[in-house]
């Protein structure tokens, strides 16, 4: 079909409401597909990749940080870029949630990425898809698998602070708590939990999140008994009592900047950095996760295959599609005059059909 934007906009404004409602319903049923931007913004992945490559020169942590942003976005109302929104008078930002405050990072990189994409393809690529592509590219650039992610998401109109506080897994979670957290967002396979936890194969963590493990586990005055004793002494040297709680420690002591399967080798040796990681192998409830840890430790390709599958499943958690939500021009704020702007998006969407 071919319409001029002005004629279609006039038609949508003047036609009886039922016709526009039917149009809206049909567009809202759109499905995610890796080819979504093949015609409208074919270079989006290259733009994202180039932005990350430039940032890695000065910030080797950024790839892991972007992957974490995507994870924390998808666990709160689906992958809708709600984590990128700043505070407004209408809602509190998810950046202030317990799992994000003083730890979520990489927002300026996403800003630069979005500006570059907007310059090449105005009003086309959502922030939700941008963050999804950025997570995939970050993994690949760090030595992990390469795959084409399903696309076509749109951006939320608000943030969800309370939901972020309720949904984001904590570093002190037990295995049953982790399973509940994943199950609550539709990730009910043990392989989802174990494979996605492998995102901790690169990146860093702050001392504040492991102090109890090192010195006062479960208020016993003793360290976590599942910690390898040699590794315990190493961590205590990096995170001493009364030390800097913001000091950084590598998640993976073997290959801290490479996306590989060494995270699982560490778990087998009781060298998981945070409690929720080691729970996958050392919990009394780990009968279903231990075989997966061993399988991934034995085969990088087995881990990569499971990780890609789990990432696609996570990326498909209740996405906004079609005419739901909007395509933000600035990932930090909802578009002003959003009703008129979103109507223009509908016109553009129909005109491309």
From Swiss-Prot:
InterPro entries: Haem_peroxidase, Haem_peroxidase_sf, Peroxidase_pln, Peroxidases_AS, Peroxidases_heam-ligand_BS, Secretory_peroxidase
Signal peptide (UniProt feature, chain positions): 1-30
Enzyme Commission no: 1.11.1.7
Record-annotated disulphide pairs: 41-121, 74-79, 127-331, 207-239
Subunit and interaction comment: Monomer.
Cofactor(s) this protein cannot do without: Ca(2+); heme b
Co-factor binding comment: Binds 2 calcium ions per subunit.
GO cellular component: extracellular region; vacuole
Entry's localization field: Secreted; Vacuole
Assigned keywords, A-Z: Calcium, Disulfide bond, Glycoprotein, Heme, Hydrogen peroxide, Iron, Metal-binding, Oxidoreductase, Peroxidase, Pyrrolidone carboxylic acid, Secreted, Signal, Vacuole
List of residues binding substrate: 169
Presence of keyword Heme: yes
Glycosylation sites: 43, 87, 188, 216, 228, 244, 285, 298
Family: Belongs to the peroxidase family. Classical plant (class III) peroxidase subfamily.
Record-annotated active site: 72
Residue list for modification Pyrrolidone carboxylic acid: 31
Gene this chain is encoded by: PRXC1A
Enzyme kind, highest EC tier: oxidoreductase
Source species: Armoracia rusticana
PANTHER family: PEROXIDASE 33-RELATED, PEROXIDASE 72-RELATED
Job description of the protein: Removal of H(2)O(2), oxidation of toxic reductants, biosynthesis and degradation of lignin, suberization, auxin catabolism, response to environmental stresses such as wounding, pathogen attack and oxidative stress. These functions might be dependent on each isozyme/isoform in each plant tissue.
PROSITE patterns given in the database record: PEROXIDASE_1, PEROXIDASE_2, PEROXIDASE_4
Principal location class: secreted
UniProt protein name: Peroxidase C1A
Chain residues that bind Ca(2+) 2: 201, 252, 255, 260
